[in-house]
Design a protein with these regions (language model features):
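Terminal RNA-binding accessory module
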Residues: 1-72, 87, 95, 276, ...
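Rossmann-like S-adenosyl-L-methionine
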Residues: 6, 12, 173, 198-409
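Short, acidic/hydrophobic/Gly-rich beta-strand patch recurrent on exposed beta strands
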Residues: 16-21, 137-141, 309
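Extended interfacial segments that mediate partner engagement and assembly in macromolecular machines
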Residues: 54-69, 73-178
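Short, solvent-exposed loop/turn elements at beta->coil junctions and helix N-caps
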Residues: 112-119, 180-184, 230-231, 389-393
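A short, glycine/Asx- and small/polar-enriched loop/turn
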Residues: 120-124, 187-189, 398-399
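Carbohydrate-binding surface patches
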Residues: 183-200
Length: 409
């Protein structure tokens, strides 16, 4: 008889974790804490194993029926924990963050309950892959080279699903060479489509796609953009006002604004203080800091986002275009710092610069518990963790956001 495994936790990435009889941890997707399962296709490594869900002997009370047909029928890899109840998802994310801080960051802290927003229909954008066989969709879980044709996404906003339906109808007019397509519902009501390809489409190709979209999309014709392999972008229709192809925006912008405000509140009074705003994006946090009386030095590497930020002239703000690693040595000594890095975290160069600069407080907005914990460990000799808050911007997935306040020892 196949060995049965009791699932005890959810790991980073969303796999369930249990222990085999030989003591090895085994990671099994689509399982829940409390499940008793028989794994299949077990692949043994020196200290752990991976497998699939073969037989579910006992179902956890945390299990629910997935809402999306693609989740089970097509093994969609876009969501990892749709089979968990909302409370179980939030607890899993709380533990993922707490365990990362303890094991990687060497920080003993009780992470409070995860704060969450809408569970469904929240994403303002999705990116689909265009397959050689005409499939337009997402990758299967554990099979990054296998696509399935996506008809609907339960975590995407209604406008995004309307765009998906329109693009499916217009798929014969998608310009040749397109490898991916991003569908986005802009904050100011500008629906947009980004075509990812080595070269921009011709005017004839763009016109044909726009004409087909006009017939299939109920609103105004979506803005159309091209995005190249080296970050190049180009507007493919006139008078476009959206954020564009390159500009990053949270999938829940209003929730992102709230997290940003929480991070700035952690700095307490910033009036007449110098604050670094690193990875500043479009400058929303910079503007809030300036409104609170701070002198701000902000750094952003994306030219498009930098240009958007510069539209607002603020006398107490100095803006720097470039990577934080390249620019941080040019900044004045700060009183406080806000960092909001990508999933790769700060990196050694930036943590060293922060340690040398010696700000009183660092508000760290993180989208990856592991790199957050790594950076906290690097800053540990000089900074201690004062506050941790966790947020679920991506229900049904294993992603967890957090804000951590670090204070100089």
């Amino acid at each position: 008889m196949t060995e049965a495994v009791r699932i005890t936790d959810i790991a980073t990435g969303g796999d369930g974790v249990g222990r085999m009889a030989d003591g090895r941890a085994i990671f099994i997707p689509r399982t829940a804490p409390g499940d008793l399962v028989e794994p299949t296709g077990v692949r043994l490594h020196s200290s752990f194993a991976k497998g699939g869900l073969g037989l579910l002997r006992e179902a956890s009370a945390a299990r629910v029926a997935p809402r999306c047909n693609h989740y089970e029928a097509d093994a969609c890899g876009g969501c990892q924990i749709q089979h968990l109840s909302a409370p179980a998802q939030r607890e899993a994310k709380r533990r993922i963050l707490e365990q990362a801080l303890m094991r990687i960051g060497d920080v003993q802290v009780d992470v409070p309950a995860v704060e969450s927003g809408p569970e469904w229909g929240y994403r303002n954008r999705i990116t689909l892959t265009l397959g050689p066989n005409g499939a337009l969709g997402f990758h299967k879980v554990g099979q990054p080279d296998v696509l399935f044709d996506a008809r609907h996404c339960e975590i995407a906003r209604p406008v995004v699903n309307q765009l998906l339906a329109a693009v499916r109808l217009a798929r014969t007019t998608i310009p040749s060479g397109t490898t991916r397509i991003t569908l986005r519902d802009g904050r100011r009501g500008h629906a947009g489509i980004v075509l990812w390809a080595d070269q921009p489409p011709s005017g004839t190709e763009s016109d044909a796609l726009r004409a087909a979209l006009r017939d299939g999309f109920p609103g105004d014709v979506p803005e159309l953009w091209w995005r190249g392999p080296r970050g190049e972008s180009k507007a493919l229709s006139a008078n476009q006002e959206g954020i564009g192809a390159v500009g990053f925006e949270q999938v829940q912008p209003d929730f992102g604004d709230r997290i940003r405000s929480i991070a700035l509140d952690m700095l307490e009074s910033v009036a007449d203080r110098l604050v670094w705003d690193l990875y500043a994006g479009r400058g929303e946090g910079t503007a809030l800091l300036a409104a609170r009386g701070a002198r701000v030095e902000s750094v952003e590497r994306e030219p498009e986002l930098f240009a958007l930020a510069q539209r607002e002239t603020l006398p107490t703000v100095r803006r720097f275009l470039g990577s934080v690693e390249e620019v941080v040595g040019q900044l004045s000594p700060p009183d406080s710092v806000v960092v909001n890095p990508p999933r790769t975290g700060l990196g050694a160069t930036v943590t060293e610069a922060l340690g040398s600069a010696g700000p009183e407080r660092i508000a760290y907005v993180s989208c990856d518990p592991a790199t957050l914990a790594r950076d906290i460990r690097r800053l540990g000799p000089q900074y201690g963790v004062e506050t941790v808050r966790a947020f679920d911007l991506f229900p049904q997935t294993a992603h967890v956001e957090s804000v951590v306040l670090l204070a100089r020892r």
